[in-house]
Amino acid sequence: MKIVVDENMPYVEPLFGALGEIIPVNGRTLTPEQVQDADVLLVRSVTRVNAALLDANPKLKFVGSATIGTDHVDLAYLAGRGIPFSNAPGCNATAVGEFAFIAMLELAARFNSPLKGKVVGIVGAGNTGSATAKCLEAYGIKVLLNDPIKAAEGDPRHFVSLETLLLEADIISLHVPITRSGEHKTLHLFDEARLMSLKPNIWLVNCCRGDVIDNQALIKVKKQRDDLKLVLDVWEGEPHPMPELVPFAEFATPHIAGYSLEGKARGTFMLYQKLCELLAIPANKRLSELLPPFHFKAVELEQTPDEKALLQLARFVYDLRDDDAVFRNGFARSNGFDTMRKNHKHRREFSALALAYHGQSEVDWLSNLGFSGVGR
């Protein structure tokens, strides 16, 4: 069995090596010739999976995408040909949620404006939005959820309108898929008019899709509104973000919010499980076997961490400032965006760090935030 796989997908060899011949490829430049005799195709979001790519392949048995979203895949085409498809919903949700939370802590420290006491509006309450809410609520932050689709489907959580969210939230975090038409279109959901209408001193975090914000309009608005603080992990025109926009972001990264070691391993592992199910063979591998030990054995706490100490704990796991610096130095180079993604040092999730607590105060919130081993 020939398995064509994006070269940036981790843990392919230990998971799929026994199932067939693995052919690593550049996912962004993948051609029909490279997949014409593949039995299995495993991709990420940089690959457009459609008739143009697959028409020349008569034998494809399975397409898997190690992503939450599927907007890069022509699902109707695959269904029409009877080719099974699976993605990895939720595989990197924890990573994205922690990224957004850490970004807010970093903004709070930079502007000496504590996160505690602020109201955070989350636009899009799917996997990543819910993971972000989980972190915030663990820390005691009031969260407003906006998701008209979830609300219409009967989701029991309390939702507010986008208008209410924009009026009440001090921070807005975006977690919607890109939808280019229809009642709930998200393409340029934040256009010039909406950006200009944001309340004073708002923080705007985007780690879903770059096109959800009109980037050209964002440049125009930022020139007029220095009070609007930005964290941008995604960009219109990836892998070529607008150079003029980058300096306007407090933190800028190359679409790596979901790039935790756990998240990336989880995405590949979910496709492995699905392919084994399709082939009717046992999935003998275990996710825990893939992950290396964390470089900190444990961190001992003498007292309940305040916000400054919490940020320090978060930085033990992931220091956003490092990726921001690398991005600013490299995004304008030829293939710089993709090179940074490919060479990204996979951060760990909070669960990799064990905390030993010796104080008397309540610390369940640290466990709820995701840290492991919290105990007295």
Swiss-Prot record:
GO terms for molecular function: 4-phosphoerythronate dehydrogenase activity; NAD binding; protein dimerization activity. This is Erythronate-4-phosphate dehydrogenase. It catalyses: 4-phospho-D-erythronate + NAD(+) = (R)-3-hydroxy-2-oxo-4-phosphooxybutanoate + NADH + H(+). It is found in: Cytoplasm. The active site is at R209, E238, H255. NAD(+) binds at D147, D233, G258. GO terms for biological process: pyridoxine biosynthetic process. Belongs to the D-isomer specific 2-hydroxyacid dehydrogenase family. PdxB subfamily. Homodimer. It comes from Shewanella sp. (strain MR-7).
